[in-house]
UniProtKB/Swiss-Prot annotation:
Start and end residues of each stretch annotated as Disordered: 1-34
Location(s) in or outside the cell: Cytoplasm; Cytoplasm, Cytosol
Record's protein name: SPRY domain-containing SOCS box protein 2
GO molecular function, one term: ubiquitin-like ligase-substrate adaptor activity
One GO cellular component, as annotated: cytosol
Presence of keyword Cytoplasm: yes
Subunit structure: Component of the probable ECS(SPSB2) E3 ubiquitin-protein ligase complex which contains CUL5, RNF7/RBX2, Elongin BC complex and SPSB2. Interacts with CUL5, RNF7, ELOB and ELOC. Interacts with MET. Interacts (via B30.2/SPRY domain) with PAWR; this interaction occurs in association with the Elongin BC complex. Interacts with NOS2.
Domains: entry comment: The SOCS box domain mediates the interaction with the Elongin BC complex, an adapter module in different E3 ubiquitin ligase complexes. Essential for its ability to link NOS2 and the ECS E3 ubiquitin ligase complex components ELOC and CUL5.
Gene name linked to the record: Spsb2
């Protein structure tokens, strides 16, 4: 199977990424990422919650970013403002590599998951109320103290994927899965069995003064009908490929059709 490329993913693709098996992304993800991103108001509406975070975290820019204070022997978490129980959702996390430290965990949590611990740990995923991927160690955590945590994505023995600054979190509440995408490639489901819950974007951090950004990419619901016009646009864009979308303006098409193909 060839690599499953997705639109609007991170442009930084590690060379080791090709060593990992790829998976078909959740139904509707390509369409979600091909659409214009939500405006700034909507992104803040789905951003970090200043009222639902550790006391050592300062939420900034209306929810688009948080900064962890330099407190020793503390792990600190934050939840998003919106919880999701239906539909397909995707959001981008930006976390500089030099600001991750020993435990940098990205995932989802219920409203009951703890947001602070008096030691350094993978807080997100430490109990039954949260699920997380440690993007430094490449380990998955759920009800875990870190012992025998599975590697994600599964690859050649001893080979660990270097996670770039930007990664995409993909939560499919229709199928009950949580997965991740980097460099435009979906890495497959990391967790299953999430149906019936309300889950919030979440991270836990240990690095003093780290700044972690969130950018909500949108939502798709299974009951949303897809028009023939919309499906035709997807086919044309897929046939051109990301590298040739700039040539749409040169095609012998009416101006209105060109604008539609470019989501203008």
């Amino acid at each position: 199977m060839g690599q499953t490329a997705l639109a609007r993913g991170s442009s930084s693709t590690p060379t080791s990424q090709a060593l990992y098996s790829d998976f078909s992304p959740p139904e509707g993800l390509e369409e979600l990422l091909s659409a214009p991103p939500p405006d700034l108001v909507a992104q803040r509406h789905h951003g970090w919650n200043p009222k639902d975070c550790s006391e050592n975290i300062d939420v900034k820019e209306g929810g688009l970013c948080f900064e962890r204070r330099p407190v020793a022997q503390s792990t600190d978490g934050v939840r998003g403002k919106r919880g999701y129980s239906r539909g397909l959702h995707a959001w981008e996390i930006s976390w500089p590599l030099e600001q991750r430290g020993t435990h940098a965990v990205v995932g989802v949590a219920t409203a009951l998951a703890p947001l602070q611990a008096d030691h350094y740990a993978a807080l997100l995923g430490s109990n039954s109320e949260s699920w997380g991927w440690d993007i430094g160690r490449g380990k998955l955590y759920h009800q875990s103290k870190g012992l025998e945590a599975p590697q994600y994505p599964a690859g050649p023995q001893g080979e660990q994927l270097v996670v770039p600054e930007r990664l995409l979190v993909v939560l499919d509440m229709e199928e009950g899965t949580l997965g991740y995408s980097i460099g435009g490639t979906y890495l497959g489901p990391a967790f299953r069995g999430l149906k019936g819950r309300t889950l919030y974007p979440s991270v836990s951090a240990v690095w003093g003064q780290c700044q972690v950004r969130i950018r909500y990419m949108g939502e798709r619901r299974v009951e949303e009908p897809q028009s023939l016009l919309h499906l035709s646009r997807l086919c044309v864009r897929h046939a051109l490929g990301d590298t040739r979308l700039g040539q749409i303006s040169t095609l012998p098409l009416p101006p209105a059709m060109k604008r539609y193909l470019l989501y203008k």
